[in-house]
């Protein structure tokens, strides 16, 4: 429980009250997580949508992962995008 509380506070501190708009912070997290082939990519895609990001912006964020992580990053991102549309 304490670890979860600490993580939540850290996450809120990095996604709100910063120079980046929440939409941009979520899109950056989509790029980073897609490049790491993380299952959490979809969570931040949902966050980006809630913050006002378009599907085109989310796709662009995934594409930014491809040069450093390869086409596998696109597979992770495309799968997460498809799941988020349902």
Where are these regions (language model features)?
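Acidic, glycine/proline-rich low-complexity segments that act as flexible tails and inter-domain linkers
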Residues: 1-24, 45-50, 74-86
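Buried hydrophobic packing segments
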Residues: 31-32, 44, 62
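Alpha-helical scaffolds flanking conserved acidic
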Residues: 21-27, 56-60
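Amphipathic, charged-and-aliphatic alpha-helical interface segments
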Residues: 24-39
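Mid-chain, well-packed structural core segment of small domains
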Residues: 38-59
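Short linear functional motifs in flexible/disordered or boundary regions
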Residues: 40, 60, 70-73, 77
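A short structural micro-motif
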Residues: 34-37, 64-71
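Hydrophobic transmembrane alpha-helix bundles
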Residues: 57-66, 78-85
């Amino acid at each position: 429980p304490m670890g979860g509380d600490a993580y939540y506070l850290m996450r809120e501190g990095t996604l709100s009250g910063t120079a980046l708009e929440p939409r941009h912070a979520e899109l950056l997290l989509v790029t980073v997580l897609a490049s790491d082939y993380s299952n959490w990519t979809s969570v931040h895609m949902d966050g980006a949508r809630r913050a006002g990001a378009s599907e085109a912006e989310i796709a662009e964020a995934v594409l930014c992962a491809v040069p450093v992580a390869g086409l596998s990053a696109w597979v992770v991102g495309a799968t997460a995008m498809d799941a988020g549309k349902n």
